[in-house]
Amino acid sequence: MKNPKRGKQLLRFEGFGLDHKNLETVLATDIDALIDVRDRILIVFEAKLDGKEVPKGQKYALQRLIGNAKAAGKHAIAIVVDHDVYDMDEDVYLAGLIAREVFTSEDMCWKPMKRKMTARELANWYVDRYFDG
């Protein structure tokens, strides 16, 4: 991160809404990390505290992002990882977080992890599997 202090600044969604009459329930969401591997592979991370569920709307957004990447001819994976850092003044390091579930462009459904892998291990495995460059 180029500016860690700026990273601690919240982007607030209050007051943000779409003005179309049929979209009053559309809410903004965030993504914790996104890696684009040379416009061929998209890796998206969502980190949750101690097994907290990913909200339904956020899951839908991740699914659509992966589906859109697939439609554009890319391999893509959304990875939900868990952390146990309760102190909000303490940083959370993505590389060592344990992956809980994934949504891939190959399967287009959420699947729990079959074996224990860190975020870094899973991202590297996915790139090794699908990157041909």
Predicted feature locations:
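Helix-rich interaction surfaces within compact, conserved domain-sized segments
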Residues: 91-133
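Short, conserved, surface-exposed binding loops centered on an aromatic residue
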Residues: 25-26, 33-37
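Amphipathic alpha-helical interface segments used for dimerization/assembly
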Residues: 65-66
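Active-site-adjacent loop/helix micro-motif of nuclease/hydrolase catalytic cores
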Residues: 51-61
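Nucleic-acid nuclease catalytic cores
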Residues: 69-98
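Short connector loops at helix/strand junctions that flank enzyme active sites
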Residues: 28-30, 40-42, 57, 73-74
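Conserved catalytic cores of phosphodiester-cleaving nucleases, focusing on short active-site segments
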Residues: 33-35, 42-50
